[in-house]
Amino acid sequence: TYANYENGYFSPEGGFHAYAEFNEGTGTLTFRRGLSKPAGAYDLNEGNATPEWRKEKEPEHNNDEFIVPGVKIDISNVVFDASFANARPTSCYKWFDMCTSLTEIEGIENLNTEKVTNMGSMFSGCHVLNPLDVSNFDTQNVEDMSEMFVSCMKLKSLNVSNFDTQKVKNMSSMFYNCN
């Protein structure tokens, strides 16, 4: 470990952690970056790994030994906190996959995508999401955009004119079932 005059130590994130926190009371998933990750917060995923906040919860047993099936958390709002602007995720794979109640994404300008290689299924199944502004996405390193907007049925318009797709290897079903 080496000293770093800005924040103490050298590490991949400069001593900072990028994470997502879910507030069950409001249905809000908030992305932040800070010196420590709070208990219960989710690490960001890498590559083709499904993010922890989109995985099914462990099934629960009630007193009669019946199993309550695992369910995904129900995300209705997403916030990218200003602190997240300095995070550099490498994958956005399935970040909001099947978030059928997601209506709003606040602060998406704080999502820096310059190092992202996978945007597959990022917004797939977001049936009621509208509007969505991806005009500032840096896609120069993205290789997978498959199913990125599948079944985004409420989107009235989507500006992808700034997308750099030179490295994209898979765009299959990118806009399938969009109106």
Sequence positions of predicted segments:
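Extracellular/surface-exposed low-complexity segments
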Residues: 1-25
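Structural signature of tandem-repeat unit edges
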Residues: 1-2, 73-87, 100-117, 127-143, ...
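Intrinsically disordered, low-complexity regions of eukaryotic proteins
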Residues: 8, 15, 45, 58-62, ...
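Short, intrinsically disordered, charge-balanced linker/junction segments flanking boundaries
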Residues: 11-14, 171, 175-179
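Generic structural motif
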Residues: 18-22, 119, 145, 171
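Short, well-ordered beta-strand segments enriched in hydrophobic/aromatic residues
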Residues: 29-33
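LRR N-terminal entry segment and analogous cap-like coil->beta motifs
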Residues: 36-120, 124
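Short beta-strand elements of solenoid repeat domains
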Residues: 97-98, 121-125, 147-151, 173-177
